[in-house]
Regions:
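Short, solvent-exposed coil/turn segments at beta-strand boundaries
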Residues: 81-84, 99-107, 119-127, 143-148, ...
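A short beta-strand motif that forms part of the nucleic acid-binding face
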Residues: 155-156, 176, 185
Length: 206
């Protein structure tokens, strides 16, 4: 188990293709950018099966929302990280992620990479997926602690990843690296790949 943890930590420090991140399409569906009122309507987070990265997933295609229609209020201690975020400062510059939340559950998607989890501190309900496109298999326990989302690979004491709000921005610590992200309000249709994806899906505004 320790050797697997070391492997994951090495992956966190591996090379990053910022140009590929910057060129990849952002979510083209305007609904992805909305943050609806969490009024308790719809299914509960527990009634929706855990999602995962599908075979053949890539940065180029974003899957449908996992928690669509679930309006369960956020758990105590959970920051509201919902929306689409773009990293503008730090090692992961250009990276974009879509965050869905309901109850004690959070789904973080980058292109077709889906990390879906309940933040109850267990491996059983945490991430059971790949670390990244072409990455090693990982199992991660997740928690919300005093407004911070924390990820512990293999439920060890080491907190490998955190996300928290800082004003209107997100601070994302990925291994030893600190990144800042801004929340996007709508699809950036001036971005070539995003515009092409929207045109292909017929979601371009009139």
């Amino acid at each position: 188990m320790i050797s697997r943890l070391i492997t994951v930590l090495k992956q966190l420090a591996s090379s990053v293709d910022n140009a590929a991140f910057a060129a990849a399409p952002r979510p083209h569906d305007p609904v992805d950018y909305e943050r609806p009122e969490l009024d308790g309507s719809g299914p509960t987070a527990a009634e929706i099966p855990l999602d995962a990265t599908k075979p053949g997933a890539s940065l180029e295609v974003w899957p449908s929302r996992t928690l669509d229609g679930c309006r369960e209020p956020l758990a105590p201690g959970a920051p509201d990280l919902r929306g689409v975020w773009e990293c503008y400062q730090g090692r992961m510059a250009g990276h974009v992620e879509r965050v869905e939340q309901a109850g004690d559950r959070i789904t973080i998607t980058t292109g077709g990479l889906v990390h879906d989890m309940f933040c109850d501190g267990t491996l059983e309900n945490g991430v059971d997926d790949i670390a990244g496109f072409g990455g090693s298999k990982i199992r991660v326990a997740a928690t919300f602690e005093d407004g911070v989302h924390k990820l512990r690979p293999f439920a060890k004491k080491v907190v490998a990843v955190t996300r928290r709000l800082d004003g209107d921005e997100m601070v994302w610590r990925y291994g030893p690296f600190r990144n800042r992200l801004r929340r996007l309000d709508s699809p950036p249709f001036d971005h070539p790949a995003t515009r092409a994806a929207a045109q292909a899906a017929d979601t371009m505004p009139d």
